[in-house]
From Swiss-Prot:
It comes from the Archaea. This is Uncharacterized protein MJ0447. It comes from Methanocaldococcus jannaschii (strain ATCC 43067 / DSM 2661 / JAL-1 / JCM 10045 / NBRC 100440) (Methanococcus jannaschii).
């Protein structure tokens, strides 16, 4: 199936919570921001990420530039703005998780950041699906734990009548 850049760009523009921009000659940055409210949201996002990466691979193939080094960023924001003030103390140290998946020729790597602490996992091979598995297996438990903290805290922080 032949897709041109315009068709792919149109498809990407239909996706929710995304930014698309060109970064100079043959440079593309795709950034996804998602508000996580339930563990199912993370699973849904991971499932969609496979489609996103598939489209990303098509974009890479269409652009013939030997210097091309594209980056797709995935930022996950944990927490709910509605409860931000209510849970400020409880979530002050762990309401934000940032994950970045980057592709640099044959290397894919996942960068995980929490509370300013950074961890990088490098992956050999052209496929980014290994990165997806790391996201799902390694970070889903962290997200579930944070969601649990939020849910457990809500009843405790509602003022008694």
């Amino acid at each position: 199936m032949n897709l041109n850049i315009k068709e792919i760009k149109q498809k990407i523009n239909e996706w929710k919570n995304r930014e698309w921009r060109w970064k100079g000659k043959g440079k593309i940055e795709i950034r996804f921001v998602c508000l996580i409210e339930r563990a199912e949201s993370f699973k849904e996002l991971v499932d969609n990420l496979e489609i996103i990466i598939c489209e990303y691979e098509k974009i890479k193939q269409l652009i013939e530039d030997k210097d091309i080094k594209e980056i797709a960023k995935l930022n996950l924001f944990c927490g709910n703005n509605v409860y931000e003030e209510m849970l400020k103390d409880i979530l002050s140290s762990n309401k934000f998780i940032s994950l970045t998946i980057s592709f640099d020729e044959n290397i894919a790597y996942v960068k995980y950041m929490e509370r300013g602490k950074e961890e990088v996992v490098y992956l050999d091979g052209k496929s980014a699906y290994k990165a997806l598995q790391i996201l799902k297996n390694r970070y889903e438990n962290i997200l579930k734990k944070q969601i649990s903290i939020i849910e457990d805290a809500i009843p405790l922080t509602i003022p008694s009548q």
